Amino acid sequence: MHTKAVYPGTFDPITNGHADLIERAANMFAHVIVGIAANPSKKPLFSLQERVDLIKEVTEHLPNVEVIGFEGLLADFADSQGATVLIRGLRAVSDFEYEFQLANMNRRLNPNLESIFLTPAEENSFISSTLVKEVALHRGKVDQFCHPAVQAALKEKLQQ
């Protein structure tokens, strides 16, 4: 079976936690689309195109991973890509309630869509894009939390 999965998120920026989930998903599914949400309700540090470019660089070693920015409903995006699986990461129990509601809403909007929840590797369980940006903002070292390309992009962006 040629199952196509979407791993959606804002990825502002992509962290080692995200990269780990993408790599694991790439081993589970024939084709993984990293769907980068434009999400107008959030004020991202990086533009949509910058986030696409960073994730392409981080995932370039994974031939079955495609990176696409999107606007609108995730359920519609997944349908337009022919995906039947949504991959979501759960860092802590506190993530579950929101993700459970989201999974049910997405299934209601697109009955062919199943949500799969992956937990992070222990060393990545506390990492979030928000925390990585906060550490970088205060000139802390983020090398253990994100890819070198992301480190360089953060440094450049925060010096502006």
UniProtKB/Swiss-Prot annotation:
It catalyses: (R)-4'-phosphopantetheine + ATP + H(+) = 3'-dephospho-CoA + diphosphate. The record marks 18 as: Transition state stabilizer. It is found in: Cytoplasm. Keywords: ATP-binding, Coenzyme A biosynthesis, Cytoplasm, Magnesium, Nucleotide-binding, Nucleotidyltransferase, Transferase. It comes from Pseudoalteromonas atlantica (strain T6c / ATCC BAA-1087). Belongs to the bacterial CoaD family. Pathway: Cofactor biosynthesis; coenzyme A biosynthesis; CoA from (R)-pantothenate: step 4/5. Its main location: cytoplasm. Homohexamer. ATP binds at residues 10-11, 18, 89-91, 99, 124-130. GO terms for cellular component: cytoplasm. One of its GO terms (molecular function) is ATP binding. This is Phosphopantetheine adenylyltransferase. It holds the Pfam family CTP_transf_like. One of its GO terms (biological process) is coenzyme A biosynthetic process. Its EC number is 2.7.7.3. Reversibly transfers an adenylyl group from ATP to 4'-phosphopantetheine, yielding dephospho-CoA (dPCoA) and pyrophosphate. Substrate binds at residues 10, 42, 74, 88. Its cofactor is Mg(2+). InterPro entries: Cyt_trans-like, PPAT, Rossmann-like_a/b/a_fold.
